[in-house]
Amino acid sequence: MRYRNYLQTKLDGVPVDGTKLPSGFQIVGHVALVHLDEKLWQYAYQIGELTMEYNRRVKSVAIRYGPTEGVTRKPAYKVVAGDLNTVTMFTEAGIRFMLDPLVVTFSRGNRQERMRLSSIVRPGEIVVDMFACVGQFALPIAIGESSRVFAIEIDPIAYDFLLRNIELNKLESKVVAILGDCRDVHPLAVADRVIMGYLHDTSAYLPAALETLSRKGGTVHMHIASPLKAIASLRDVISSKAAEKGFRANTVTRRIKTYSPGVEHLAFDIRLMPS
């Protein structure tokens, strides 16, 4: 039975609008993350308990009460049912992760993009991840044949989980973790490939990404949340900033998924050559 139908059946007799019930939830380890309409918050505990009944792997249920905030990308969830301890461990594509999804952002929905990037990195490449978080891009890449990954993270809590995950996966010799703002602490002129997995005003960080790129050129993968109608202007910004740093840019745009009404999660794959 589908999740929404399950909730409707179990909440029979409770005055809720079935169309406002969530159609699904994200599982991170033992934690279920639920987007619940504000009008249903008074039933959050019941829905949380039913979510654990629906999926026996779930031991904690948290609802979203606001948007992800700030440069540290702090999510806004609170536990409404189950275990209050939301530090969890799980394996994705052979990589072991430890994190707290109520404290750091980890989207299981971006798994395909993480796997795509790890598959296109060539042996011997040096990769810089500008927004590493707990290592969701950096570690799948490092476990392959790339020579080294520099993983930069501004949030001390996410950075601590990043260090733990590097150790869990025995990647100490391949991943260099750096704590700080990527605009201030990025390595210079070393990278064959740069990953920018931050969605908000990402183009403002592009000059730093171009500075970390090898002078012989390479590829920048820039993610951003934007309306589709802004693609042309974003491509112009990319070309302009590349020219300022001595590069010519050849850009391919991909849609990853819908981010919010009218806004898409876009990826710009930017191939850069010396001008």
Give the predicted meaning of each segment.
Residues 1-275:
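SAM-dependent transferase fold signal centered on methyltransferase-like domains
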